Amino acid sequence: MNQIPMQYFNLAKENYSKYGLSVIQLIQIGKFYELWHEPDTSSKQQAYSQAELLVESSIRSRSLEVTPPIEQVASLLDMKIISLGKRSLLQMGFPVYSLTTHLSTLLDKGWTVIVIDELVTNKSGPKQRAVSQVYSPSCNLEDCPELPYVLSIYFSQDDLLGITLFSAMNGHSIIFPVSWTDRDKVTRLLISYHIREIVIWADSGVCSNILINKIYNLLIGWNLFPSEPNAKIEAMGEILTNLPCYLSYRYENNSKEWLLLHIYIGINTEWLNKNYQKYTLSKIFQSTWTENVNQANLISLLGVLQFIKDRNPNLIKNLQLPECYNSVVSPLNLILCNRAEYQLDLLSKRGKLGGLLNLIDYCSTAMGKRLLKFRLLNPITDYSELNLRYKDISIFKRLLNQKIFDNSELKCIKDLSSLHRQWAICASSDTTLPPKKLSQIYHSYLFACQLISKLTNNIQLPPLVGPQLKSLIKEIERIFQVDSLLGDFKDVIQPIGNLPNLFEQRQTLRAQLTEWAEQISNIVFQDTTSIKAEYFNKEGYAFSISSKKLTKLEHYMMNTSISNNSIIVLGKRGSHHIITSPTIHKVSIELNELEEQINIYVKQTYHQELKRLYFSYSELFLPLVNMISRLDVALSGAITAIKFNYVEPCLTLAKTQQTKGFIEAANLRHPLVEQLNTQEECIAHNISLEDKGMLVFSVNGAGKSTLLRAIGVNVILAQAGMYVAADSFKLRPYNYLITRILGGDDLYRGQGTFEVEMRDLSTILQLANYNSLILGDEICHGTEVNSGTAILAATIERLINAQTSFVLSTHLHQVCSLIDSPVRYYHLSVIQQENSALIYERKLKPGPGPSQYGIEVMGHIINDKKFYNSALKYRKLINWEPPSQGELTVFRPSKYNAQVFIDSCEICGAPADAVHHIKPKSEHKKLCNRKLNRRSNLVPVCSSCHLDIHRNKISILGWKRTPKHKKLYWVYTNESLDSGTK
C-alpha cells in the first residue's frame, strides 16, 4: 500500500476511536473528494436489534448484517463505487465544489464527515494533507430550517442528572438538574428542541452494564432511542467483547430521524475541580457565573463544550451565557402532561400529513418558524404577555384586511440568528466570514429596516432597534462595496486607507502592458487588437495572441534589434497562446506583488472591520432577531385567523383571589378536522367548564375523541397567544393540561392497556386542582364493567372535590346512578333509521342518551343480518327483560303512510311533530284515500312551521325531482325567494 492510502486508513482508525462509528472520511485528490474502503476487511461497525441490546452481552445472539459505510453513502448520494482490480481499493467520489451540496444529506442521515484537504505550500515534492474540517449532525453551521442541538447528560453517583442543551448554530444553551425520580418531566422540554446527538457522561466507578441499560431505558422514555424491539441500531464493534471508555451508536428514533449516541465512561478529573471550572468557563463565556450552579450541571456543560471543541474549536468561541434553571418545569407555563402534544397532534408525524403546527404556520422566516413551534409547545399563563400577543395579531389582521401590508419584507430576511453566530465566531478567530454571508446579512438588514418603517406607526417596537440598525447599515455601506460582495474578493472593500495608492500603482503598470501590446500589434499586424494584455490565474499577467499570428510575431521579433525581445510561450488557452518576454515578465512580477499586497490589505481590512462592527453592534443582534421573530409569528397568526375564521380569545379575571381555570366557548371547532375532513361538515359545539365538569356519552365513531381534542387544541392555541377556532372563546388560563386520549398496551414497559390507563390516571389524580384541565377518553375501558364504573365514579368525585375542569367520555352509563355531585351529562347524537342505518349527527345534546348501542353500530359496519339478530338475542338475555331504553331512538312512521317518518321538519330542520297534507282533503273529495296519502302529498313538519302553513305564511309548492334527489319547494307568501330543502 502506498503512502496516501496508508495515511488515509491510519487517520480513519484514529478518527473512529475519537468520533465514533459514524465517520465518513473524505480525502482531497486534486479536484475531487474521495471515499475509500479496503475490501475483505472486517467491519468495525456491528448492528443489533433493540431487544438484543437490552439483554446482557453474554446471552446476545449474532449481530445483524452491516452494510459498509462506502456502500451506504454511494446509495445515499446515488453514486457508483469503482475498483481498479480484484484486490484494489473500493473508491467513490465527487467534485470538490459539490461538497456543500452533499454535506447536508450526509449529516441528515447521522454521519460525521471528516474532510482531509491538500495543504497549499511552496515546497516541491508530494502534496501534504491534513484534516481541515469535522462536521457532525449537531456541530456544523450548514443552513437548516431547525436548529440542531446536542444533549449532554451527566450521571452523578447520587442519582442526579445534569442536563445541557447546546446549539452550535446560534450558540444557545440551557442547563438544569433533574433527579432520577423526576426524569419523565424532561420529555416535556425536549420536544421543543431538535436533538441530533446525545452525549452521556458517567463516573468510572459505576457498574458499566447496569449503567448502559439505565441509559437505554432513560432515552426510550424520552423518545430518543428506538422503542420497537426490532429496530436496527448500529454500534461499535467492541461492545460485545468488553465495555470500553467510549461507546458510539447510530440509529433512527421513533420519529424516523437519525441520531448519534456517545457514551463516555469516566470523566476528566479536572472537571470536578472548582478552580478549573471557574477558569475554563469564565474564559469561554467572558464572565464568572459558576457560584450558584449545580455541580452536575457544570460537569454536563464542560462535557458538551469539550465534545464541541473536539470537532470544531471555533464553535465554542464568543458564546452567550447559558440559560440556567433549578428545575425542568417553569411555573409560568401551561404544562402538557401525558405527552399531550402527541395525543393532540400538535406536530406532524415524520413523513405524514397533518399536525396543528403545519396548519397554522404561515411564517416567512426560519426564526419565526422556530418561535411559533416553541410557543405552541410551551403555552403560557401570563395575562399581560398573552394580551400583547393577541394585540399584535389584531393589528396585523387589520393591516391585512386594509391591504396596506404583506409579508414581502419578511420573505427576504435570512436566518439572522445563524448568520450572527457565524459572524461572532469569525470575530473571535482567524476564520473569515464569506462575503456571501455578509451580503445576506446586509440585505436582511435592509428589509428589516423597511419592515420597521412600515410598522412604526402601527405597532409598538423596541425603540433602539431601528436607529441602531440604520447606523449599522450606514457603516457597512461606508466600508464595503455592498454591490460587489458576491463578486471578486478584491472588490469588497471601499477604496480607503492605502488602497487607493495601491490601485493607482496597479493601474499604471496595467496601462503600460496594454500600451506595449497595442504598439506591437500596430507595428506587426497594423491593428491594436491582435495582441492583448490579460491576467491569467496560473501564469499571471501576460500577452494573448492567436496561434495563427504567433509565427509572424516570432519572425518579426527575431529580425529586430530590441534587447530582451525573445518570446516565451507559457501555455495555450483554446485557439490562443499565452506569451511573455523578459521585459513583460518583469512588469508582471511587479503587478503580481501589487496584487498580493492588495489581497492582503483587503483581507486584513475586511476581517478587522467586521470584527470592529461585531463588537460595536453585537448588543443589537438579539433584540433584532427577537423583534423579527415576534412580528413574523404575529403576521402568521393574522393570516391563519383570516383564512380559517378564528377569533381572539377573551381572558377573564377571577371573581375571587383563587384564579380557577375556566373555558366558555361558542361553536368550538377542531382546527385540523374542519380543514382536513372536507367530505362532511365540521360540527361545532358550545362548551362551558366554569362550575361543573362534563361527562360525554355516545356511539363509537360519533366524535367523542374529536370533541376532547378540539377543547385541548384550542386551549393550547389560546395560551400560546394565538386565535382559536370558535365564534367566541372566554378563558382563564390553566397551569396543567392532562390528556388521556390515546390508549393501548405499552410494550416497552410490559404493561397492558389497563395498567397504562392506571398509570395515566395516577398522573391525573396527582395534578388535579382548580388550575388543571383534564381530558379523558373512555377512562377505565380496559377492565370489566363493575370495576371500571367504580373507578370512574371515584375519579369524578376526586376531580369535583379538587374543583378541576374536566371533560370525560365513557360508555359506562351506570356511573350516572352512582354520582351525587354536580356533573353535566351530554351525548353526541346519532340517528338510527328503520333499516338499521346510522347517521352521525354529532351534535352535543344534554343528557346521557341511549345506554345500549354497540350492536346497532356493529350492524352498521358488519353486513350480516343473521349475526346481528344473534347479538340482539344475547343482549336481551343479559338484560333479563326487553330493554325499554336499549335501542337508539327510532322515528315513528306516519299514520297516513308507513313510508313517511316523522323525523325532522323539512322546512326548518327542527324535530317534526306532525305530517302535513300538501293538498288538503277538501281538494280530494272525489279521490280515494290512497292518492290523498301518497308520499308526494305528505311532508313532516314541526308545530311552528305547521302553524305558519295554516296561517298562510308559508306556501308549499310540492316535491320536485332533481338529478340527484327529491327536493321540497316552498316559499314565504310575502317573498318570491325559493326556499327548497332536500
Swiss-Prot record:
It holds the Pfam family HNH. Its main location: mitochondrion. InterPro entries: DNA_mismatch_repair_MutS/MSH, DNA_mismatch_repair_MutS_C, DNA_mismatch_repair_MutS_core, DNA_mismatch_repair_MutS_N, DNA_mismatch_repair_MutS_sf, HNH, HNH_nuc, MutS. SUPFAM superfamilies: DNA repair protein MutS, domain I, DNA repair protein MutS, domain III, P-loop containing nucleoside triphosphate hydrolases. The keyword DNA repair applies. GO terms for cellular component: mitochondrion; nucleus. Residues 905-951 form the HNH domain. GO terms for molecular function: ATP binding; ATP-dependent DNA damage sensor activity; endonuclease activity; mismatched DNA binding; zinc ion binding. May be involved in DNA-mismatch repair. This is Mitochondrial DNA mismatch repair protein mutS homolog. It comes from Sarcophyton glaucum (Toadstool umbrella leather coral).
